[in-house]
Amino acid sequence: MTNIRKNHPLMKIVNHSLIDLPTPSNISAWWNFGSLLGLCLGIQIITGLFLAMHYTSDTLTAFSSVTHICRDVNYGWIIRYLHANGASMVFTCLFLHMGWGIYYGSYTYSETWNIGILLLFMVMATTFMGYVLPWGQMSFWGATVITNLLSAIPYIGTDLVQWIWGGFSVDKATLTRFFAFHFILPFIIAALVMVHLLFLHETGSNNPTGIISDADKIPFHPYYTVKDALGFLLLITLLLTLVLFSPDLLGDPDNYTPANPLNTPPHIKPEWYFLFAYAILRSIPNKLGGVLALVLSIAILAIMPFLHTSKQRSMMFRPISQTLFWILVADLLTLTWIGGQPVEHPFIIIGQLASFLYFFLILILMPTCSLIENKLLKW
């Protein structure tokens, strides 16, 4: 009898991707975050679909429809908070996934890495548009401030902003189009994830040592499916704890006030996962310079393969590079803290120093350090 798993055209693809996939035998828990992101995407699409059934993208009724979901729809409150806090889980896993990629030198798989960066940009765009939909104060003013940044682009900036708004300010047209894009983008992200995996399976997974492990591979199932299942359990436990005990912990109280174009909140700030980029944006007094720094803070990841000067792929056996990596992590945490603070002394100078250090570490210190470590290998 023929084995359907190995011979059926569709099952064969699943088999080669999830069951008989040759996987390095020494990959650690850091390799769990890819599958956790897949779980998060699934949760977000399902909860988002149910929310979209009850949400109305009209400036007059958007806020009320979200209230209606929480009060009147069966289990609407849990669906809404799973979706809102699910976004925080997505970014927690994303940052850890990227951090591990940098630490273990996975960016040398340039196709997989570049599609990952494209995915990051798309996830950030989707999340930003989703934050606008409840039409609270922070939704409205966040949309106004962030879209207004495009006006810094010379010559076409003002026209571009009005084109995105669909008028002369953030209004009904803006909300409707943001809802449309917020709905469609996760499906495009899901398709890109498939391409991300396609390129990954062309080369095979990296491992903590950074050394080619073709001589020592084990099947993905059952060894890593069980490991992923444990990760799923921990992630769902963490998400449900957050949703059931303190669902508004990561939100902004201002978003429980309906949007009012005549009343500006005292501190306009995005969700916690954008604060590091927001701090970099604010640290440069010039508007265009700030926007460029904001884009480059993410786009800089694309040149990481070209900045890799070490003879070793992973940082596992490179203590000086490890130190710089953890300084970079501390710097990003500092930027996240600064992004949530008001624009006043001493936060301005701390933000500027942290922003400078971020670029200096990635562009100068880490490549230089790798060259020094290469010299030390000969001693």
UniProtKB/Swiss-Prot annotation:
InterPro entries: Cyt_b/b6_C (IPR005798), Cyt_b/b6_C_sf (IPR036150), Cyt_b/b6_N (IPR005797), Cytb/b6-like_sf (IPR027387), Cytochrome_b (IPR030689), Cytochrome_b_C_euk/bac (IPR048260), Cytochrome_b_N_euk/bac (IPR048259), Di-haem_cyt_TM (IPR016174)
Transmembrane domains' residue ranges: 33-53, 77-98, 113-133, 178-198, 226-246, 288-308, 320-340, 347-367
Binding of heme b b566, residues: H97, H196
UniProt-listed PANTHER family: CYTOCHROME B
Function noted in UniProt: Component of the ubiquinol-cytochrome c reductase complex (complex III or cytochrome b-c1 complex) that is part of the mitochondrial respiratory chain. The b-c1 complex mediates electron transfer from ubiquinol to cytochrome c. Contributes to the generation of a proton gradient across the mitochondrial membrane that is then used for ATP synthesis.
Swiss-Prot/TrEMBL keywords: Electron transport, Heme, Iron, Membrane, Metal-binding, Mitochondrion, Mitochondrion inner membrane, Respiratory chain, Transmembrane, Transmembrane helix, Transport, Ubiquinone
Official protein name in the record: Cytochrome b
CDD domains reported for this sequence: cytochrome_b_C, Cytochrome_b_N
Cofactor(s) the record lists: heme b
Chain residues that bind a ubiquinone: H201
Details of cofactor binding: Binds 2 heme b groups non-covalently.
Cysteines joined through disulfide linkages: none
Annotated compartments: Mitochondrion inner membrane
Signal peptide stretch: none
UniProt-listed PROSITE patterns: CYTB_CTER, CYTB_NTER
Originating species: Ochotona alpina (Altai pika)
GO terms assigned for molecular function: metal ion binding; ubiquinol-cytochrome-c reductase activity
Mode of membrane association: Multi-pass membrane protein
Biological process per Gene Ontology, one example term: mitochondrial electron transport, ubiquinol to cytochrome c
Subunit structure: The cytochrome bc1 complex contains 11 subunits: 3 respiratory subunits (MT-CYB, CYC1 and UQCRFS1), 2 core proteins (UQCRC1 and UQCRC2) and 6 low-molecular weight proteins (UQCRH/QCR6, UQCRB/QCR7, UQCRQ/QCR8, UQCR10/QCR9, UQCR11/QCR10 and a cleavage product of UQCRFS1). This cytochrome bc1 complex then forms a dimer.
Chain sites annotated for binding heme b b562: H83, H182
GO CC list: mitochondrial inner membrane; respiratory chain complex III
